[in-house]
Amino acid sequence: VQTCALPISEVFEALGKCGLDSEKSEVKRWYDGFIFGEYKDIYNPWSILNYLDSQQYTTYWANTSANSLVAKLVREGNRNIKSKFEKLLCGECIWSEIDEQIVYDQLNGNEQAVWSLLLASGYLKVLSYEKYKDIPEGTEPKYQLALTNLEVKLMFHRMIHDWFAIDRKSGRV
């Protein structure tokens, strides 16, 4: 965890050193939410370093990752994918099975693979999950998923807004 992410203690220490103690709750709202196994309250270093440098709240991480695949999967996804994605954008949670063995060729139209990719990529976080002992034999557990943080939510809002702007320019509906 320490090599690819920052724990809350290090983030708050850095905020203090920069005279930004009063921003802790807002930084947490914007950039917290990553979970690595039992490690919670984990932050993306890129977003935190950029925030400390600029002291502006914005979507730093979104501008660096390859979001084109995610955008394609959501935009071209079936009605159920779009409906669940809308719930996520409204701050609700969704339930889905997760496939830890995502295969690129299986992404199109495979709802479970889409949520698995979004989870593995850090766009979603697990809030809770069913334990094998609590579900019928032969079924897979479902996971309660939510958007990771405000930064991710705003990135997706902007992505969808841009789709409509492109469609208006091209005359498509």
Predicted regions and their residues:
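Short secondary-structure boundary/capping segments
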Residues: 1, 49-59, 66-67, 133-134, ...
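Short, small-residue-biased leader/transition segments that mark boundaries at the very start
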Residues: 2-6, 173
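Extended, charge-enriched "interface" segments that sit outside catalytic cores
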Residues: 93-95, 103-105, 109-112, 129-153
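Winged-helix-like regulatory helical subdomains adjacent to P-loop NTPase cores
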Residues: 5-115
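A short, conserved structural fragment
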Residues: 119-131
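Short, amphipathic alpha-helical interaction segments positioned at domain boundaries
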Residues: 141-172
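A structural signal for short, well-ordered beta-strand segments and their strand-loop junctions
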Residues: 42, 125-127, 173
